[in-house]
Swiss-Prot record:
<dbReference type="GO" id="GO:0005769">
    <property type="term" value="C:early endosome"/>
</dbReference>
<feature type="compositionally biased region" description="Pro residues">
    <location>
        <begin position="304"/>
        <end position="341"/>
    </location>
</feature>
<feature type="region of interest" description="Required for WASH complex assembly">
    <location>
        <begin position="1"/>
        <end position="54"/>
    </location>
</feature>
<dbReference type="GO" id="GO:0003779">
    <property type="term" value="F:actin binding"/>
</dbReference>
<keyword id="KW-0653">Protein transport</keyword>
<dbReference type="GO" id="GO:0031901">
    <property type="term" value="C:early endosome membrane"/>
</dbReference>
<feature type="compositionally biased region" description="Basic and acidic residues">
    <location>
        <begin position="392"/>
        <end position="407"/>
    </location>
</feature>
<dbReference type="GO" id="GO:0043014">
    <property type="term" value="F:alpha-tubulin binding"/>
</dbReference>
<feature type="region of interest" description="VCA">
    <location>
        <begin position="359"/>
        <end position="481"/>
    </location>
</feature>
<protein>
    <recommendedName>
        <fullName>WASH complex subunit 1</fullName>
    </recommendedName>
</protein>
<comment type="function">
    <text>Acts as a nucleation-promoting factor at the surface of endosomes, where it recruits and activates the Arp2/3 complex to induce actin polymerization, playing a key role in the fission of tubules that serve as transport intermediates during endosome sorting.</text>
</comment>
<dbReference type="GO" id="GO:0005829">
    <property type="term" value="C:cytosol"/>
</dbReference>
<keyword id="KW-0472">Membrane</keyword>
<comment type="subunit">
    <text>Component of the WASH complex.</text>
</comment>
<dbReference type="InterPro" id="IPR028290">
    <property type="entry name" value="WASH1"/>
</dbReference>
<feature type="region of interest" description="Disordered">
    <location>
        <begin position="429"/>
        <end position="481"/>
    </location>
</feature>
<dbReference type="GO" id="GO:0006887">
    <property type="term" value="P:exocytosis"/>
</dbReference>
Length: 481
């Protein structure tokens, strides 16, 4: 028996359905019908079995998820009634596999029963004689695909014709390196040069279209306003947090743990905040460097001038500086009222301790510079430029110290007076011109000796202005008289 089957395949279809051919003998047709029904029964049984297995598998997975949910609910219910604090640790990763399982069809691994060999059955009946008339009659009823679209005789194809079926992309539809569709309009075109040579019929039928006018933005040189793009970036903001005034401890509350206390300092929060200055790490300090730096800092602090300009530090050679001169320098001013007298005494006595502390500081600094000290000593022995008579540095510094104390006393006594302010301004200008301002006094002990320029000599020659103390005292006597 020769069995002819026709198979219809679809995408993803595993099984093939046999079709029974016409014009078969009765016995042969019965055998093919029986085989087709048995084949259909086997296919349906296999399909329903696979569907049932898939449903059962999904049901088991759903049951496992339900059991996990019930277990979690039971644990939550158990924790609810407890008054003890419970720590719950959550996994850092989402409980899912790194790679999701791909979908698999239920027909994977299925075998088509038609591919199996079947026993051959011998047909006893004879073949029918061929009838040409019956064959011709059957041909009359066969479906024939007829193109019902009528084509006019006047219509002429302008391009290459209809699109082929094997066109997969737009690049294969258009001419290379151009935008010309040759199936719609055929042109002679060099893709590299860009020159177009059209056919004679195309030139006759095509109408010349003038280009459109340029837009107003080009003809009138107008510029369109550029719209600023909106910013959709998320900026976290804490916003307004309501202040709730509640007591720190509420006893006997249901469902609240009573064996755990929280402190106010819980560490950095998740909200945006200004970085604190305490977050800067402290660098470790070394022993020797720290001692040296601390010593140098103390020296700088001692040498730094306070708001009232202090006297310059004395040279390292003299160590027996008499303390009484500050007291004697404060005595000459006229006797003011008792309260200013206490202020004067305190001002006069206050510079004494810094002088003692400042004495020792330069001696420590000058010790290592033996070469410079020997050079200065040789210059002093030589007599300077032209063997000029050098004044004693100690005397000059004592005179300047007395002069500054007199200025301070005058400023404190006649504070707020127009003449005293003018006197102070003139004194400051003289110091600025001579280069002996308060900024250059605390630099080093050798600064006054080295600043022997022309301006310094001129400022020494100019006598200082008289202090306005006597005039103020005379005015007071006149008012009392």
């Amino acid at each position: 028996m020769v069995r002819m089957t026709q198979k219809r395949y679809l995408e993803g279809q595993v099984y093939s359905v046999p079709l029974i051919q016409p014009d078969l003998r009765r016995e042969e047709a019965v055998h093919q019908i029986t085989d087709a029904l048995q084949y259909l029964e086997m296919i349906s049984t296999d399909i329903f079995t696979r569907v049932s297995e898939s449903v059962e598998k999904n049901r088991a997975h759903l049951q496992s998820v339900t059991d996990r949910i019930k277990l979690a609910q039971a644990r939550v219910q158990k924790i609810k009634g407890s008054k003890k604090a419970t720590k719950v640790f959550s996994s850092a990763k989402y409980p899912a596999p790194e790679k999701l399982q791909d979908y698999s069809s239920i027909f994977t691994g299925a075998v088509d029963p038609a591919s199996q060999k079947r026993p051959r059955i011998k047909v006893q009946s004879k073949l029918r004689p061929l009838d040409d008339k019956a064959q011709q009659e059957k041909l009359m009823y066969l479906p024939v695909c007829v193109n019902t679209k009528k084509r006019s005789e006047d219509e002429t194809e302008e391009g290459l014709g209809s699109l082929p079926r094997n066109v997969n992309s737009v690049s294969s539809l258009l001419l290379f390196n151009t935008t010309e569709n040759l199936y719609k309009k055929y042109v002679f075109l060099d893709p590299l040069a860009g020159a177009v040579t059209k056919t004679h019929t195309t030139l006759e039928t095509e109408k010349e279209d003038k280009p459109f006018d340029a837009p107003l933005s080009i003809t009138k040189r107008e510029q369109l306003e550029r719209q600023t793009a909106e910013n959709y970036f998320y900026v976290p903001d804490l916003g307004q947090v309501p202040e709730i005034d509640v007591p720190s401890y509420l006893p006997d509350l249901p469902g609240i743990a009573d064996d755990l206390m929280y402190s106010a300092d819980l560490g950095p929060g998740f909200a945006p905040s200004v970085p604190a200055s305490n977050s800067i790490p402290e660098l470790p300090s070394f022993g020797t460097d720290h001692d040296e730096s601390s010593g140098s800092d103390s020296q700088f602090k001692l040498e730094a001038p306070p708001p009232p300009p202090p006297p310059p530090p004395p040279p390292p050679e003299p160590t027996h500086v008499p303390v009484p001169p500050p007291g004697t320098s404060a005595a000459p001013p006229p006797p003011p009222p008792p309260p200013p007298m206490t202020a004067d005494n305190t001002d006069a006595s206050s510079p004494a301790p810094p002088t003692g502390t400042v004495k020792g500081a330069p001696s420590e600094v000058v010790q290592p510079s033996n070469g410079r000290a020997s050079l200065l000593e040789s210059i002093r022995n030589a007599g300077g430029i032209g063997k000029a008579n050098l004044r004693n540095v100690k005397e000059r510094k004592m005179e300047k110290k007395k002069q500054k104390e007199q200025e301070q006393v005058g400023a404190t006594v006649s504070g707020g007076d127009l003449m005293s302010d003018l006197f102070n301004k003139l004194a400051m200008r003289r110091k600025g011109i001579s280069g002996k301002g308060p900024a250059g006094q605390g630099d080093s002990s050798e600064a006054p000796a080295s600043s022997g320029g022309a301006f310094a000599r001129m400022s020494d020659v100019i006598p200082p202005l008289p202090a306005p103390q006597q005039s103020a005292a005379d005015d007071e006597d006149d008012w009392e008289a």
